[in-house]
Amino acid sequence: MLHMHIASWVLLIILFFAAYFNFSEKQGASPYFKPIHMLLRLFMLLVLISGFWVWIQSFSSGAAGGHMLLTLKMICGVAVVALMEVTITKRKKGQPSHGLMWTTIVVIILTMIIGIILPMGPITQMFGL
């Protein structure tokens, strides 16, 4: 389930940038915007469901520590999904969205850093921490 979660958030980030840049402030939406936005929403659901599943598995396995970080990552993940949707919606309505775009990028990076240092993350597994 962890591999599906990682693959879905990688595709989610790619689709977010594709949707954001397929909507021009002057010309409006490109013909590809609506399908990309629908795929973006589908992958948002996949990320949330798989992330919640990983969260449940981690708590039920009784793994030593990391529960506070895992809960923080879950909150950051929900914030990323919410920020992505609000950013695309503001861009679609013609309102300024550059600040939200940068906020979304910062929260994405923060969420990825938390995910990397979690007990199931690559850094922890690589060094046996």
Swiss-Prot record:
GO CC, any one term: plasma membrane
Pfam families reported for this sequence: DUF1516 (PF07457)
Protein name: UPF0344 protein SSP1805
InterPro entries tied to this protein: UPF0344 (IPR010899)
Signal peptide start-end: none
Subcellular location: Cell membrane
Keywords: Cell membrane, Membrane, Transmembrane, Transmembrane helix
Membrane topology: Multi-pass membrane protein
Disulfide cysteine pairs (residue numbers): none
TM region(s), chain numbering: 1-21, 36-56, 68-88, 100-120
Family: Belongs to the UPF0344 family.
